Curated annotation (Swiss-Prot):
Name of the featured protein: Iron-regulated protein FrpA
Annotated disulfide bonds: none
Gene symbol of the encoding locus: frpA
Keyword annotations of the record: Calcium, Cell outer membrane, Membrane, Repeat, Secreted, Toxin, Virulence
Entry-linked PANTHER family: S-LAYER PROTEIN (PTHR38340:SF1)
Cellular component aspect of the GO annotation: cell outer membrane; extracellular region
Length: 1115
């Protein structure tokens, strides 16, 4: 997609992508007015302090005192710091514009620094601004209203004390920059506080002059606490150095500031720049170069190797690189160029101190004495060899006029410090001898001939004739057309090829001006398309070559001449095919004839000369026609789209304004929605088409309501049977943009507004910083790489976000609109997925694998934004999903260790790699340990507790619980209730106490670890041992007993040690003692003196078993 630079109501150049709209005068007037009135707002905060009257002299004293305190002493001592301050102005204003464009919001604090810098710059430049008002307007340095206010000041009686005001503005700027965020936040209560009326009147009305300085002084005073007031206690600094100050400022502005300003703005085209580095629509057309025109030339200036590493060049880079008027046509075009560490041999023929064009280089644009043009650079230089010795040196009259241009900033514009004499560089002579080398230097440039020059120390270095790549598409006229106020309001596109900026071209052509006016006034797409061809042609007809060249012809015979026609590189020349004898059919000839007019138009737009086109076959000729038509159609489409927001859609955009919400300026689109609905009442098709094109080609990323409005229009059109008709008016490309599901490498907007075949769509952002907007269906959104934004409004359905992006530095966001706040949503976790669900069940967003690596993995969403300005980062989301509710929750620990409390409900708790504390609390809970040494507590209810790899402690609590230790040396406590305990592998300990109920232990393991059963609160004599089949039952009472399942199956099922309060039983031969009395204890359920079952020998048998096994428990 194409980037475009637009100037918005004098606010400055703002880069919008793609084909982005101006925001409209209403919106930006409101915004700029708000900026201007911010000082008024701050003034009102401490209004009570303004009761103290301050005189003008006190104000002067304050300003001078402050300037002295920061080391300026009434003069500019550090130009670099001022230039750095200027950098901040541009950077901060661009950042504010970016925030507004991408989010529709900005914090007032974000513009505080920019405002302060503006006031400082205004103060520093007051003397020179008076003389440069119009120049500053062209540079778009300050907002329109601020410039207007300053101009009114300078044209009023205030001019008599301009230096005083200059001091005040400086001081004001510094104080605004230092102003505290807290106080500023307290003052922002209502957008009505930001009316521009006071300051507008403050500066504009000359009759208020007598009060102005006092008012400004009072304002400054209100910003400063009493204990920091710099002007209390004397008048030592009054009026110091005012004249010197003004003189130094003017000198600084002329010598340092203004050139810097112009250079800065050269990096950002001042006009509606609709060309990327190399537009797609021109690619195939320019590939016809080897088949175009019987005349060609290359740019071949002489260059000198100044640093000893050979002659180096750079590629033609469109507007980002050097632009130079090689042909002396008054048009600077993009060109290959010599690198900054080497130089071009030049001669200032007109003595204006500037290298104006190719005639002042040494090459094929150098005019010789006989009126012809030089064949190459060496031939051009040879004319200066007045003594015929084949060397150019001091013996030749013109030697002293030669200069070497070392283009340090690579802009193609010579500055005084870039032009150096041969003497300065230690060059003694230039040798006219050379060899043809035709060396490819890369970047489209060639070293055609190479010789040498001699230095004053006797050494030699390389000198050569370059063939530089040419790009005539990217061009800038060297002169400017003065526009009237009315002409300056016309729609505009940047000049291209041999065409001036559209607005300037219209000022010079009545036909174009009338056509542009008619086109701008057309109210429907159909009406504009009916005029588009005529508009394109009228602009092309302003080409200075229009009508001067011979009609285009076809040929199979290529003839090479020099110096005229299309600029080709040597590689392009080599591609030409000569002397092919082919005749064309009548059909092909007719197609060529039909394309002639379009070929002439494309020549004007691309700076080419296609007076002759060459072909090798009929297929070749027809392909020329196809490329011509395709290129023209793409050109027309680009012009239409880039004029769209300056013409037909401009009235809608004028309805956008600003509102204040939660201390944040926000774009207010309510008027825009009303405007579309108003049009729809009388012309539904126009409203449908206009809204669709605004969404397809605009940059209103934050206007989510517009997507829903479009979806409503689509549904209504379908019901009315008009949808197919509306789509035909829109065209396939617009429909495809609104229905597309896959992005590109650019910053795409993917949206479900009903143009697709399915209500449920899948959106893929791929590369770039994309915006993916789900509709009412169940959508799948995958952002890909880049900083992506996923947008969800009310009724967003059951959507899935897949956000895998491992790149560093990216920032992915989920944005909830339509007034959705965090309180309206629940945040839960399921496995590694984040589930964001509307409490009214109107939708759910599942962010897949969000919690991989505890939310630091490649799937994370960095921030979740809400309309009220609240932002949730990853850390906050991690806390939210660990909060329990009264329902059944799923809570997960993190790798660093967590404490989870399930609360009420039947909960699921999951440990991780850390040492976790997992409390189920009330309810029938399921608790799963992780890899750490975890503590699991079931609490009330019938719980299931599962250990894992670590040495875990499992406590079932009240209820009939299931405990499984798995791996590790675990401790299992069943607690009250009839519990099931399974230790798993490792040396496990089972704890049994009074009131624990009737528990079952399953202790099977294949390892040889030692397991323990600990009876707390019991002595050895209190517990009776019973064999029940293959199980061992240990009973302390009828209510409290433990059954060890399969104890007598073998060693793998046994508990090795029984620990009591007074002793421990531990013997690997324990089973044989039990077996000796097997017939005595079998089938007994209660210990005691039950002689009917035991023959009166039970206690004796138990004693005989226990006696050898008694050991004293360790202390």
């Amino acid at each position: 997609m194409t980037s475009a630079n637009f100037n918005i109501n004098g606010f400055g150049d703002v880069k919008l992508t793609p084909y982005s709209p101006l925001l409209g005068y209403k919106a930006w007037d409101s915004f700029i007015g708000s900026i201007q009135s911010l000082s008024d707002l701050i003034y009102n905060v401490d209004n009570n302090r303004n009761k103290m009257e301050i005189t003008v002299n006190n104000a002067i004293q304050a300003a001078d005192s402050f300037l002295s305190s920061i080391g300026r002493d009434n003069k500019i001592t550090n130009t670099a710091s001022l230039l750095a301050s200027l950098d901040n102005i541009f950077l901060n204003l661009r950042n504010v514009s970016r925030d507004i464009r991408e989010t529709g919001k900005f914090k007032p604090n974000d513009i505080q620094q920019a405002i302060g810098d503006i006031f400082i710059a205004a103060g520093d430049g007051l003397q020179y601004i008076k003389q440069q008002t119009e120049a500053m307007a062209q540079s778009k340095f300050l907002p329109t209203k601020l410039k207007t206010g300053l101009n009114d000041v300078l044209n009023s009686r205030m001019l008599k004390s301009s230096t005083v005001l200059q001091h005040e503005l400086n001081y004001l700027g510094f104080k605004i920059k230092d102003y505290g965020n807290e106080r500023l936040g307290e003052s922002i209560m209502n957008i009505d506080d930001f009316t521009p009326s006071k300051i507008a009147n403050f500066f504009a009305d000359p009759d208020t002059y007598s009060n102005v300085l006092e008012e400004v002084s009072r304002f400054i005073y209100s910003l400063v606490p009493d204990d920091a007031n710099p002007w209390k206690g004397g008048e030592d600094y009054i009026g110091r150095g005012i004249s010197e100050w003004g003189e130094l400022l003017e000198k600084w502005y002329k010598q340092d500031f203004l050139p810097y300003l112009e250079k800065e703005w050269d990096q950002f085209p001042k006009f509606e720049d609709w060309l990327p580095e190399f537009p797609e629509w021109a690619r195939e057309w320019l590939k016809l170069d080897p088949k175009r025109s019987g005349k060609y030339h290359v740019y071949d200036p002489l260059a000198l190797d100044l640093d000893g590493d050979g002659i180096e060049t750079v590629a033609a880079k469109g507007f980002a690189g050097a632009l130079f008027d090689h042909r002396n046509q008054g048009i600077r075009t993009a060109t290959g160029w010599v690198s900054a560490d080497d130089g071009l041999l030049v001669r200032d023929l007109n003595g204006n101190g500037i290298i104006d064009n190719g005639a002042e280089l040494f090459g094929d644009n150098t005019k010789l004495a006989d009126g012809s043009f030089a064949k190459h650079g060496y031939a051009a230089l040879a004319e200066l060899d007045s003594n015929g010795d084949n060397i150019i040196n001091a013996a030749d009259a013109a030697f002293q006029t030669l200069r070497v241009w070392q283009d340090l900033n690579q802009d193609g514009i010579s500055q005084a410090n870039e032009l150096r004499t041969l003497e300065e560089l230690g060059i003694q002579s230039l040798d006219l001898a050379y060899k043809d080398v035709n060396k490819n230097l890369g970047n489209g440039n060639t070293l055609a001939q190479q010789g040498s020059y001699t230095k004053t120390d006797g050494t030699t270095a390389k000198m050569g004739d370059l063939l530089l790549a040419a790009d005539n598409l990217h061009s800038r006229f060297k002169d400017k057309v003065e526009l009237t106020a009315e002409q300056a309001k016309a729609a505009n596109l940047a000049g291209i090829g041999r065409l001036r900026d559209l607005r300037e071209a219209a000022a010079l052509s009545g036909d174009l001006a009338n056509m542009l006016k008619a086109y701008s006034a057309a109210e429907t797409k159909e009406a504009q398309l009916a005029l588009l061809d005529n508009l394109i042609h009228k602009w092309a007809e302003t080409d200075s070559n229009w009508g001067k060249k011979s009609p285009m012809r076809l040929s199979t015979d290529w003839t090479q001449t020099a110096n005229e026609g299309i600029a080709l590189t040597p590689s392009q020349v080599a591609q030409l095919k000569k002397n092919a004898l082919v005749s064309l059919s009548d059909k092909a000839k007719a197609a060529i004839d039909a394309a002639r007019d379009r070929i002439a138009v494309l020549d004007a737009y691309t700076g080419q000369d296609s007076s002759t086109l060459y072909y090798m076959s009929e297929e070749d000729a027809l392909n020329i026609v196809k490329v011509t038509n395709d290129t023209y159609d793409h050109l027309a489409k680009n012009i239409y789209q880039n004029l769209l927001f300056q013409t037909r859609l401009q009235p809608y955009l004028n309805q956008i304004s600003f509102k204040m919400e939660n201390d944040t300026f926000t774009l207010d689109f309510s008027g825009l929605v009303q405007a579309f609905n108003h049009v729809k009442e009388t012309n539904p098709q126009k409203a449908f088409v206009d809204l669709a094109e605004m969404l397809a080609y605009g940059e209103l990323r934050s206007w989510y309501e517009g997507r829903r409005l479009m979806a409503d229009y689509v549904e209504e059109a379908k019901k009315a049977g008009k949808f197919e008709d509306y789509q035909k008016v829109l065209g396939q490309e617009t429909v495809a943009l609104l229905a597309k599901t896959s992005g590109t490498q650019a910053d795409d907007i993917l949206q479900n507004v009903g143009f697709g075949h399915n209500k449920n769509v899948s959106l893929y952002g791929n590369d770039g910083n994309d915006t993916l907007i789900g509709g009412a269906g169940n959508d799948y959104l995958e952002g890909g790489s880049g900083s992506d934004t996923y947008v969800f409004g009310k009724g967003f359905g059951q959507d899935t976000v897949y956000n895998y992006d491992y790149a560093t530095g990216r920032k992915d966001i989920i944005r909830f609109t339509d007034g959705i706040t965090a309180d309206m949503l629940t945040f839960t976790r399921e496995g590694n997925h984040l589930l964001i669900k509307a409490k009214d069940d109107s939708g759910q967003v599942t962010v897949q694998s969000y919690f991989q690596n505890d939310g630091s993995g490649a799937y994370r969403i960095d921030e979740i934004h809400f309309d009220n300005g609240k932002v949730l980062d990853v850390a906050t989301v991690k806390e939210l999903v660990q909060q329990s509710t009264d329902g059944s929750d799923r809570l997960y620990a993190y790798q660093s260790g967590s404490t989870l409390n399930g609360g009420l409900g039947d909960d699921y708790l999951y440990g991780a790699d850390g040492n976790d504390l997992l409390n189920g609390d009330a309810g029938n809970d399921s608790i799963y340990s992780g890899n750490g040494n975890d503590t699991l507590d079931g609490g009330e209810g019938n719980d299931a507790l599962y250990g894992y790899n670590g040495n875990d402690a499992l406590n079932g609590g009240e209820g009939n619980d299931h405990l499984n230790g798995e791996d590790g040396n675990d401790t299992l406590i069943g607690g009250a209730g009839n519990d099931y305990l399974e230790g798993g592998s490792g040396s496990d300990t089972y704890v049994f106490g009074e009131g624990f109920g009737q528990d079952t232990v399953y202790n099977y393991h294949v390892d040889k670890n030692s397991d323990t059963m600990h009876f707390k609160g019991f002595k050895a004599a209190d517990v009776h041992f019973i064999r029940s089949g293959s199980d061992l039952v240990l009973s302390a009472s009828e209510q409290d007993n433990v059954r060890i399942s399969g104890f007598f199956y073998g060693e793998n099922h046994r508990v090795d040690t029984f620990v009591f309060d007074d002793a421990a039983i531990s013997n690997p031969d324990f089973a044989k003692y039990i077996n000796a009395g097997n017939n005595l204890v079998q089938s007994m359920s209660v210990f005691g003196s039950n002689t009917a079952a035991t023959g009166g020998n039970v206690d004796a048998n138990i004693q005989s078993v226990q006696q050898p096994l008694l050991v004293t428990p360790s202390a």
